[in-house]
């Protein structure tokens, strides 16, 4: 057979070995988080945002997962502890995951037991306007959550203001980059 003649007997095999997870929960298990309760999964063009908690613990967590044709891969996460104390004192609880080389935006999310919490306003000093996040039912019945994410958020310093449907402030906290300040709100009064 000549150098440029076609050989019809050659067969090429392409094999793909998939080491990534096929679901977001499987990706979390592969990252060492076995017993999680997914509160909300938000699929975006850039990846998947997962808001979850570990049953029996007083915390909420965020994770960002890469998602492509090979599956899901855990990239980064954040945990906020003592959420019930935070909500009792400030009227709301939150967790934040900073933007990075792997995560295209800063993410704020929270959980609440206050049925009167309708919306959370996220403000940062660079903005002249607040970003609103409506409170909605999570994947777990009876659990209310909220989420806001933007590539414009820096996460360096911020305020979170919880509003009732009537626009009354029922939650308020701020972070100046080094210290969290809780503005005490009597949430019993708002009910």
Predicted regions, residues:
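Short acidic/glycine-enriched loop/turn segments that link adjacent beta-strands
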Residues: 44-48, 104, 142
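Short amphipathic beta-strand and strand-loop transition segments with alternating hydrophobic
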Residues: 36-42, 93-99, 134-136
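Long, contiguous interaction/targeting segments characteristic
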Residues: 1-88
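Structural motif
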Residues: 109-116
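Short beta-strand-to-loop capping motifs
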Residues: 52-54, 112, 149-152
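Short, surface-exposed coil-to-beta transition loops
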Residues: 58-61, 104-107, 132, 156-157
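Ser/Thr-rich low-complexity repeats and stalk/linker segments
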Residues: 33, 119-190
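Extracellular ectodomain segments of secreted/surface proteins
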Residues: 82-109, 180-190
């Amino acid at each position: 057979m000549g150098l440029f003649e076609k050989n019809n007997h050659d067969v090429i095999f392409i094999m793909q070995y998939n080491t990534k997870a096929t679901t977001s929960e499987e990706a979390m298990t592969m990252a060492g988080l076995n017993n999680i309760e997914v509160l909300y999964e938000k699929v975006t063009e850039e990846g998947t945002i997962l808001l979850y908690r570990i049953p029996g613990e007083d915390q909420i967590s965020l994770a960002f997962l890469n998602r492509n044709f090979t599956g899901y891969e855990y990239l980064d996460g954040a945990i906020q502890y003592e959420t019930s104390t935070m909500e009792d004192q400030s009227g709301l609880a939150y967790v934040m995951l900073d933007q990075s080389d792997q995560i295209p935006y800063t993410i704020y999310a929270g959980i609440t037991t206050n049925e009167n919490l309708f919306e959370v306003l996220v403000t940062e000093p660079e903005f002249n306007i607040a970003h609103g996040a409506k409170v909605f039912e999570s994947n777990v019945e009876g659990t209310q959550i909220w989420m806001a994410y933007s590539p414009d958020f820096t996460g360096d310093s911020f305020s979170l203001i919880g509003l009732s449907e009537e626009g009354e402030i029922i939650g308020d906290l701020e972070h100046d980059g080094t210290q969290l300040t809780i503005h005490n709100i009597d949430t019993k009064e708002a009910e």
